[in-house]
Amino acid sequence: VSYETKVKQALDICFNKNYFKGNKNEKAIVMYSGGMDSVSLLWNLLEHTEQDIHVHSIHIDNSEGRCKAEAEAILDSINYMKKNQRPFEFSSSVYSLKAQYPGGKDMTLALFQAMRVSSAISKQFNIVYTGDYSIGREEGAEAQGVLNALCTNRRSKPIWLAPFEEMTVISLERSKGIYLSMPEELREMYWSCRKPTEVGNGFVVCGECHACKRQEALRKDLTND
């Protein structure tokens, strides 16, 4: 299987395990950060399924200071997919907490907000997608618990799917599959750095966070290939 089809393969495995068909009767919300994983996931869902897709971005305004950089990546990549893919819905929200530490776990916030969106637009989703993988037991349990709690008075509850968990556990190989499974234009639009510095009209990556190190390893490997 070529790298370009790795994400499609992961989606197929995910659907088979959870009895989904990928058809237009299935309603899904994609939690979208503008990073490499969520950008590739959204493109592949639009490309390889007929699911009714709603995309939601949370602008996380915290001590890491990446909110503006991510917002630009979200704007650029969503506009690209609006022009080059089938129709989908988009919404966004802001979570702001300026303290010494970011505070809390991203997955818990993502699943909480997914169900808030469901209530706000009066739409029952079958699936909540996130582009994460290797989610720790504690974080996964906390996030799933929040999702369950927010479905207390609902007749149905969406299933949380993280398709990239079906890919290889070898980090670099998985990254290559995610990266190469989207168009070249989108590869130039996503944002990864957790602690960027704003300079003039742009942003400079820190080069030290785990996301920057992942991107550096990916670039080196692709250059060697």
Please place each PLM-identified region on the residue numbering.
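Nucleotide-activated chemistry modules centered on ATP-dependent adenylation/adenylyltransferase
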Residues: 2-225
